[in-house]
Amino acid sequence: MNAINELLTEHEAVRLTIEILKKIGQRIDATGKISSTEHVEQLFEFFSTFVDRCHHGKEEELLFPALEQVGISREGGPVGEMLQEHQQGRDLVAKMKAALSQYLDGDGNAARQLKKHADEYITLLDNHIDKENNVLFPLAVKHLSANTLAGMKKGFDTIESEKVGEGKHEEFHRMIDSLERIYLH
């Protein structure tokens, strides 16, 4: 699998988790409660580790600098926009984690706050993934050489083993499969 295909495949996993988050949000709307704080914590771990450290790490450390080297602008361009959205995602995950903590401390309004931030995160990621899949990644395929992409893939493997940890990727996929069976079937 080449570097860009790896990022596209990771987007599929992210889309599944945001569908699961939508279902959890629907349950919050119906009951005012979080049906499983454990499942929410698992999703937050996925968002922080897989989405941010792994996936965004690959983009920020390798893809974006490579695009800048071939003249794709950071300021006012797609790279800058993606970086800004990555930060917005981090901020929203922090807000969701804070709301979960407040919920666990007995705050009756915290579930709805979590749902509000989850909705914002879902919208952000849906739009972000569309931009990357349909604009940024085609730019990368067009402008980056096969050698650059091959080197990038090796770098991706290093990020995965060093920032995420051996076996963690597979562990996340098992978690997603389990939550998918609970929430989406």
Regions found by a protein language model. Give the residues of each.
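Small-residue-biased structural context
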Residues: 1-185
